[in-house]
Regions:
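Metal- or metallocofactor-binding catalytic centers and their adjacent structured scaffolds
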Residues: 5, 33-34, 38-106
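Short hydrophobic-acidic sequence motifs that mark active-site Asp/Glu residues
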Residues: 30, 36, 41, 150, ...
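Residues at beta-strand starts and edge strands
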Residues: 27-29, 38, 119-121
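Conserved active-site and cofactor/substrate-binding residues in soluble primary-metabolism enzymes
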Residues: 25-26, 52, 72, 85, ...
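Metal-dependent enolase-superfamily TIM-barrel catalytic cores that perform enediolate-based chemistry
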Residues: 112-202
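Short, Gly/Pro- and small/polar-rich lid/capping loops
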Residues: 1-27
Length: 202
C-alpha cells in the first residue's frame, strides 16, 4: 500500500469572520492510498486542538505510516493511531481514504459496504460575523440554487451581543424564503452570563 500527501491551498468563496479571527483561505491535506490499482482519497483539515497546520498533519501521518501499517486492518490502524496520540483531525483524512479504497475495491458505495441506508444528512452552509446589510447580500448568494437546508450563523461579535442580535434578526428576515433550519455558533465569543442571556433570547 502506497500512501502519499498533497498540501493544497483552499481559498474560501467569502472570508469567514468568527469571534477570534478572520479566515480567507487555509491549507488542507489530501491523502491518497494506492493498492492493487485502486486509489482511495481522503482529506484532513488542521484544527485548533491537535495538528494546527497542514505540515503538522503530514508529520503526524508520516509517523503513523512508519509503523508499517500496509497489511493492517482499518481498525488496527486506528488503534495504532490512538496509541501514538495522532490528532483526530490528522487521522480523519487517512481513515476516509482507507474506507474509500475499501469501498472501491468491493465495487460498492461505502454506505452499502457498511450495511447502512443511503445518507440523508442535510447540508449546512455557514455565514460569518457581519453587518445586517452584508447579511442581506450574502444569504441570497449562498442559497441561490443551493440544496443546503441549514444555515450556521457565527455570532460572538467583538462589538457585543447587541450587535449579534441585530445581525441575527436580519438573518431571520433574509432566510425566510429559503425555509432554513438555523444554528448558532459563538466560538467562545460570549462569557457565561452573555451565553445564558443569548440562549433565552434566541
Amino acid at each position: 500500500m502506497k500512501i502519499s500527501f498533497q498540501k493544497v491551498l483552499l481559498n474560501k468563496r467569502f472570508p469567514l469572520k468568527i469571534s477570534r479571527f478572520v479566515s480567507s483561505s487555509c491549507y488542507n491535506v489530501f491523502i491518497k492510498v494506492e493498492k492493487d490499482g485502486i486509489i482511495g482519497w481522503g482529506e484532513s483539515a488542521p484544527a485548533e486542538k491537535g495538528a494546527k497546520t497542514a505540515d503538522e498533519i503530514i508529520t503526524e501521518l508520516e509517523k503513523l505510516i512508519k509503523t508499517n501499517i500496509s497489511n493492517k486492518s482499518i481498525s488496527e490502524i486506528e488503534q495504532i493511531s490512538r496509541e501514538l496520540k495522532i490528532s483526530p483531525c490528522s487521522y480523519a483524512g487517512l481513515d476516509i481514504a482507507l474506507w474509500d479504497w475499501k469501498a472501491k475495491k468491493a465495487n460498492m458505495p461505502l454506505h452499502a459496504l457498511l450495511g447502512l441506508p443511503i445518507p440523508k444528512t442535510k447540508t449546512s452552509l455557514t455565514i460569518g460575523i457581519m453587518s445586517p446589510e452584508s447579511v442581506k447580500e450574502r444569504i441570497p448568494l449562498l442559497f441561490h440554487n443551493s440544496t443546503a437546508k441549514y444555515l450556521k450563523v457565527k455570532l460572538g461579535s467583538p462589538d457585543g451581543i447587541d450587535t449579534d442580535k441585530l445581525m441575527y434578526e436580519q438573518v431571520l428576515e433574509s432566510s425566510k424564503k429559503y425555509n432554513l433550519g438555523l444554528r448558532v455558533d459563538a466560538n467562545g465569543g460570549w462569557n457565561t452570563e452573555e451565553a445564558k442571556y443569548m440562549i433565552e433570547w434566541l
